[in-house]
Curated annotation (Swiss-Prot):
This is L-lactate dehydrogenase 1. GO terms for molecular function: L-lactate dehydrogenase activity. Belongs to the LDH/MDH superfamily. LDH family. InterPro entries: L-lactate/malate_DH (IPR001557), L-lactate_DH (IPR011304), L-lactate_DH_AS (IPR018177), Lactate/malate_DH_C (IPR022383), Lactate/malate_DH_N (IPR001236), Lactate_DH/Glyco_Ohase_4_C (IPR015955), NAD(P)-bd_dom_sf (IPR036291). Substrate binds at residues 83, 89, 121-124, 149-152, 231. Coiled coil: none annotated. One of its GO terms (cellular component) is cytoplasm. NAD(+) binds at residues 15, 36, 41, 66, 80-81, 102, 119-121, 144. The lineage of its organism: Bacteria, Bacillati, Bacillota, Clostridia, Eubacteriales. The modification Phosphotyrosine is found at residue 222. Its EC number is 1.1.1.27. Pfam families: Ldh_1_C (PF02866), Ldh_1_N (PF00056).
Amino acid sequence: MKKNTKISVIGAGFVGSSTVFALMNGGLASEIVIVDVNKDKAEGEAMDLSHGAAFVKPVVVKSGDYKDTEGSDIVIITAGAAQKPGETRLELINKNYNIFKSIVPEVVKYNPNAILLVVSNPVDILTYITYKLSGFPKSRVIGSGTVLDTSRFRYMLSEHFEIDVRNIHTYIMGEHGDSEIATWSLTNIAGMDVNEYCEASCKKCDGSLKYKIYDDVKNAAYHVIEKKGATYYAVALAVKRIVEAILRDENSILTVSSLLEGQYGIKDVYMGVPSIVGINGVKDIIEVPLNDEEKNNLTDSAKTLKESLDSIF
């Protein structure tokens, strides 16, 4: 990892500020710039975070405008409007499209060589919009995708099986949203297919249990929002993990939102799929062997995203 790494975060809300906190704790940057339309909010977050500088690796955290982001290695976009009660998904997309039309050109102007990491929702749609607005190669425009959803899936499986979450391997793929799919056919524990492990461990693993776990994963954000108003800690850790893979050139396989160009029979859509992530962004997309039901569900997820995109482009 290079010594002097600069990261800029656009958006000083819950997700943006939590992301900066996670990046600081991970020692992943020597400079972090926070930009927000509310300059006082950005300045306040930078001050608060900077006051903890004595407890982490050397890092300068400051607020600024787009000019101050110049020379960033990675620009993380967390800004955007939140969905209001009664507001349709399409209305939210159009609102955020207009916001991104003001953000992305400014980011590109000062950071022509940066990797753009989109976190704002709906993340797959906004990552595609960022790709189109930026003119960057697809490898350098990435969405947080289903990295968090995959972590939620592994966690819930670990709770059921009473196994360390790090020893459970599986993916959530597709849209970061209601049409996402769980790859049960690929789920393995201790090198065993999940069904084999169920038999070996005498744990319940029937269709109803699988559906409940999948449903809990899919609706996890709604449950958290109902309890505390917003989700931000776990997504910040997911973003930190993606940034880590990029800066350390790990070639890690993460379900980031990547541009599909024929993989899985899907074209011209950004969605969460297993991708090799390294110093230059997305190095490659891995086509994992899904069963027929999973393939069909992934295709349906892509159609859902495509319909939203067709309303804009």
